[in-house]
Regions:
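PAPS-dependent sulfotransferases, especially Golgi type II membrane carbohydrate sulfotransferases
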Residues: 1-12, 17, 181, 186, ...
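Short beta-strand segments
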Residues: 13-15, 38, 140-142, 164, ...
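A conserved segment at the C-terminal end of the G1
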Residues: 22-34
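A short acidic, amphipathic alpha-helical/loop segment
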Residues: 23, 151-156
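Acidic-histidine catalytic/liganding microenvironments
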Residues: 31, 157, 237
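PAPS-dependent sulfation machinery
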Residues: 39-141, 186-210
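Conserved nucleotide-binding/hydrolysis micro-motifs of P-loop NTPases
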Residues: 42, 169-171, 249
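Conserved phosphate-donor/acceptor-positioning beta-strand/loop module used by diverse small-molecule
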Residues: 142-143, 156-177
């Protein structure tokens, strides 16, 4: 089956690790018109592109970014096309093609579990879409590895929709620290990369000083620096939304309906089933897991972090205008170089909740 470089609609779903992107991505994936690519920028890192591109990239960089994005959109490995849970029934794919594709995914995953990972890691998983059916496809690409490239990527894909998720600083830091303790991350904390952008420099962060900070404070600064860049990018885009993790967790059905509509999609029975099953889960939790008790997860950090740890995190967060997204937090003493999200329904809007 011949596959075009670009489908009818593209949605870029970005956020920091542990910010709620996976649940939102699988929410979209449950929709029968969505084709989902899970973190293809981990398969192809794009090291030839700048980590901290200019907020207004030039034409040459946009062209190079577009070539890279075309590669990501076409990446169909087990990681990018077979993330769990697998939603097989799609409007753009025949029933037979759906069954064959699901069987292939389960078979490749079984081979990976018995040690054949190096052989199967790059094995392509077919999309199973006839050329005539691509016009009904909405392709959703999720990334937690490229928050500083969000603006570059969105500009390189004119007409795309952007959704950026952001989590309360204490919730983000608590979850990241838990992951560090569990050894859940493939890569070590990269101080040099984090401090290379203008955002870190604006806050006066220097490598020698930063490395002496406790991990809790390093993670808090990571929340500030990366989210500041992404929110600055969102403010410059014509079709972008910011979503607070807690708002979506507290009202998943309303939030899903609004975000799907933003992407030109409706709330379907399959998606409603996913919302119900994934938010009312009462079993044992794992670090990387879509099915959770949403109500219990929202404020989990209040029990994981001591009052003193919460105060240290918030002292750093309050140095950023990001706290404008949480009115209950004290107004910051020091600003950064972007305006709070407007409330007029345009770029940078807080799509759900306050």
């Amino acid at each position: 089956m011949r596959e075009p470089a670009v489908p009818a609609q593209i949605v870029l779903l970005f956020g920091l690790p542990r910010s709620g992107t996976t649940w939102l991505a699988k929410l979209f994936d449950s929709h029968p018109d969505v084709l989902y690519r899970h973190e293809p920028d981990i398969v192809h890192r794009g090291g030839h592109l700048p980590d901290w591109p200019a907020l207004e990239p030039d034409a040459a960089l946009l062209a190079e970014a577009r070539r890279y994005l075309d590669l990501l959109l076409a990446t169909r490995t087990l990681k990018t096309s077979g993330s769990r849970p697998v939603f097989s029934q799609k409007n753009y794919r025949s029933r037979l093609a759906s069954h064959l594709r699901a069987a292939l995914i389960h078979g490749v995953r079984a081979l990976e579990q018995v040690g054949a990972g190096p052989l199967t890691r790059r094995l392509p998983i077919p999309d199973g879409i006839a050329s005539a059916d691509w016009a009904r496809v909405t392709l959703v690409l999720k990334s937690v590895s490229s928050p500083t490239r969000l603006g570059l990527f969105a500009r390189a894909l004119p007409g795309c929709r952007v959704i950026f998720t952001i989590r309360h600083p204490c919730g983000q830091v608590a979850s990241m620290r838990r992951g560090e303790q569990l050894g859940a991350f493939e890569e070590a904390f990269d101080h040099d990369w984090l401090l290379a952008g203008e955002e870190a420099q604006a806050h006066g962060l220097e490598p020698a000083m930063f490395q002496r900070l406790p991990i809790l404070e390093q993670l808090a600064w990571q929340w500030v620096i990366l989210n500041e860049r992404a929110v600055a990018d969102v403010a410059r885009l014509p079709a972008a939304r910011i979503v607070r993790h807690a708002d979506l967790a507290r009202a998943p059905r309303a939030g899903a309906r609004e975000l799907l509509a933003f992407a030109g999609l409706s709330l379907t029975p399959a998606t409603e089933t996913f919302i119900r099953e994934s938010t009312e889960y009462d079993g044992e939790g794992r670090y990387y897991q879509v099915f959770r008790n949403a109500a219990a997860e929202i404020d989990k950090w209040r029990h994981e972090l001591s009052a003193e740890e919460q105060a240290r995190i918030l002292a750093i967060a309050r140095r950023s205008r990001l706290v404008a997204l949480w009115p209950e937090l004290t107004a910051p003493e020091h600003g950064c170089a972007f305006s709070p999200a407007p409330a007029d329904g345009h770029a940078g809007e807080g799509a759900i909740g306050d």
